[in-house]
Swiss-Prot record:
EC numbers: 2.7.1.16
Pathway linked to the protein: Carbohydrate degradation; L-arabinose degradation via L-ribulose; D-xylulose 5-phosphate from L-arabinose (bacterial route): step 2/3
Gene that specifies this protein: araB
Domain of life assignment: Bacteria
Lineage of origin: Bacteria, Bacillati, Bacillota, Bacilli, Bacillales
Organism, scientific name: Bacillus subtilis (strain 168)
Enzyme class: transferase
GO cellular component: cytoplasm
GO function term, MF aspect, one: D-ribulokinase activity
Catalytic activity: D-ribulose + ATP = D-ribulose 5-phosphate + ADP + H(+); L-ribulose + ATP = L-ribulose 5-phosphate + ADP + H(+)
UniProt protein name: Ribulokinase
Keyword Ribonucleoprotein: no
Family the UniProt entry places it in: Belongs to the ribulokinase family.
UniProt cross-references to Gene3D superfamilies, sorted A to Z: 3.30.420.40
Length: 560
């Protein structure tokens, strides 16, 4: 019997699964919440206040995930570690950290623990927007070809704007860093003791391509003179394709996890992209939505097309032999959680408690009794900026049509609908750019738990939606890549299509559009597009308001 382990490092926790290599059966799962969660107000040790739009993490939390979840899998199943042939990991991205020459994160060194820029910058760290704006302006002026691969704009969430922020605001941290690395690649570095960067993280998040490499030293010098040789000084390390073996588990990490030294370790992956084989997708025309705090949209293509506002397209970035496309929405589950935590009245909290259900479930039940358009509400889903297709973290959310009779469930439904409209806009943009999308798949917590949301997505997109058979698709995907890293000789696979066919899975559930609802959503979506054009491109009132807010925040901070 052969097994692999997949570990998925999410926004708030890490989860691991132990999977049977031949059948894809998930024998056990284990979850570890991050002790420091998201650090977005104060630094953990010093209490130092952080500016707005910051989102940091502590890398020690990631090691705790490995230390607790993997032994838990072994304990739950009784599987002999000698039968575990490989391990794969995936991570949120772009999530980066500066490290020293031994691989130690700078924030874990006493001399840097009071330095905010020494910590992990989480994917939703949006404080680098002005640096992204500058990068995009220079790239446009210089006619840099790489911009087209990223839909015409580099997001503030990606690596280089975040590094620019470090270089400008904390040059001593930039200089002290031996390397700046994706958290995904850092975990693999810890597991096997050698630094091998992933073509997935480098391609989608760091402006690297298999054919052209990184942009030139001259370009980086224009961003910041200290960054001229960044690719040699800070981004060094060989780049390897997903599906390859990065190395073997070290003695130290074997002791930490309970696995055997020499266990195959896969090249790191990104949480969205790794989920593709977990739902059995191995060919173009099928878009997968990974729906959680945010949503990532990924799909395969026969060739590279330029798609406005996409996050990126990378040859062999998702599966070998295909162009892998990515788009996304910065705020989906976070969107709904914000409303539940800040806007739901006590009476609804009490009703949910009496019914022994969560507030999300209560609101979904109530909202499900409404017809599309019945509330007269329309929202823009930009509570955390817009990733695709406008690529602007400085845009903010909006709700239109409220009256004194508006109810919480109506607002909740409008927020859900707004995220569905955003997904439809992404789908249409791909299609208009020559990338076919014939089938829609969904994975993640929302797809797993909320039929109300998924039916709205089916109605808004007017497409059937198939659902992942695993509640932890990224972890299953990582386990599949762990089987590839081990190879057929060790009981794994040499072919991703065979691995996906045997280990990937779907539920027997398909959400089918309601024709009557879809007709109403055609009208509502047309109005949504008008709002997107006006507030996203014509009137910059959202940005002006944000500027005033930040000035007032800075002024208040100085007084305190």
């Amino acid at each position: 019997m052969a097994y692999t382990i997949g570990v998925d490092f999410g926004t708030l926790s890490g989860r691991a699964v132990l999977v049977h290599v031949q059948t894809g059966e998930e024998l056990a799962a284990a979850v570890k919440e991050y002790r420091h969660a998201v650090i977005d107000t104060v630094l953990p040790k010093t209490g130092q206040k952080l500016p707005r739009d910051w989102a940091l993490q502590h890398p020690a939390d990631y090691l705790e995930v490995l230390e607790t979840t993997i032994p838990s899998l072994l304990e739950q199943t009784g599987v002999d570690p000698k039968d575990i042939i490989g391990i794969g990991i995936d991570f949120t991205a772009c999530t980066i950290l500066p490290i020293d020459s031994s691989g130690q994160p700078l924030c874990m060194l006493p001399e840097y623990e009071e330095e905010p820029h020494s910590y992990v910058k989480l994917w939703k760290h949006h404080a680098a927007q002005k640096h992204a704006d500058r990068l995009n302006q220079i790239a446009e002026e210089e006619g840099e070809a790489f911009l087209q691969r990223y839909g015409g704009k580099i997001s503030s969430e990606w690596m280089i704007p975040k590094v620019m922020q470090i270089a400008e605001e904390a040059p001593h941290i930039y200089e002290a860093a031996d390397r700046i690395i994706e958290a995904a690649d850092w975990i693999v570095y810890q597991l096997c003791g050698s630094l091998k960067r992933s073509n997935c993280t480098a391609g989608y998040k760091a402006m690297w391509s298999e054919k052209a490499g990184y942009p030139s030293d001259d370009f980086f010098e224009k961003l910041n003179p200290s960054m001229k040789t960044i690719t040699k000084d800070k981004l060094s390390g060989s780049i390897h394709s997903v599906g390859e073996k990065a190395g073997s588990l070290t003695e130290k990490m074997a002791k930490l996890t309970g696995l055997l030294p020499g266990t195959a370790v896969a090249v790191a992956n990104v949480d969205a992209h790794v989920s593709v084989p977990a739902v059995g997708i191995t060919e173009p025309g099928k878009m997968l939505m990974i729906m959680g705090t945010s949503t990532c949209h990924v799909l395969l293509g026969e060739e590279v097309h330029i798609v406005p506002g996409m996050c990126g397209v990378v040859d062999n970035g998702i599966l070998p032999g295909y162009a892998g496309y990515e788009a996304g929405q910065s705020c989906v589950g976070d969107h709904f959680d914000w409303f539940v935590k800040t806007c739901v009245p006590p009476a609804y909290q009490e009703e949910a408690k009496e019914k022994n259900i969560g507030v999300h479930e209560l609101l979904s039940e109530k909202a499900n009794h409404q017809a599309p358009g019945e509330s007269g509400l329309l929202a823009l889903d930009w509570w955390n900026g817009n990733r695709s297709t406008l690529v602007d973290a400085d845009l903010t959310g909006m709700l239109l049509g409220m009256t004194l009779l508006t109810k919480p469930e109506e607002i909740y439904r409008a927020l859900v609908e707004a995220t569905a409209y955003g997904t439809r806009m992404i789908i249409e943009t791909f299609k208009e750019s020559g990338v076919p999308i014939e089938e829609l798949f969904a994975a993640g917590g929302i797809a797993e738990k909320n039929p109300f949301v998924m039916q709205i997505y089916a109605d808004v997109t007017n497409m059937d939606i198939k659902i992942s058979g695993s509640p932890q698709a990224p972890a299953l995907g990582s386990a599949i890549f762990g089987a590839l890293a081990a190879g057929k000789e060790k009981g794994g696979y040499d072919d991703i299509k065979k691995a996906a066919a045997n280990m990937g899975k779907l539920k027997d559930i398909t959400y089918t559009p309601n024709a009557e609802n879809a007709a109403v959503y055609e009208k509502l979506y047309a109005e949504y597009k008008e709002l997107v054009h006006y507030f996203g491109k014509e009137n910059h009132v959202m940005k002006r308001l944000k500027t005033i807010k930040n000035l007032q925040f800075s002024s208040a901070a100085k007084k305190n």
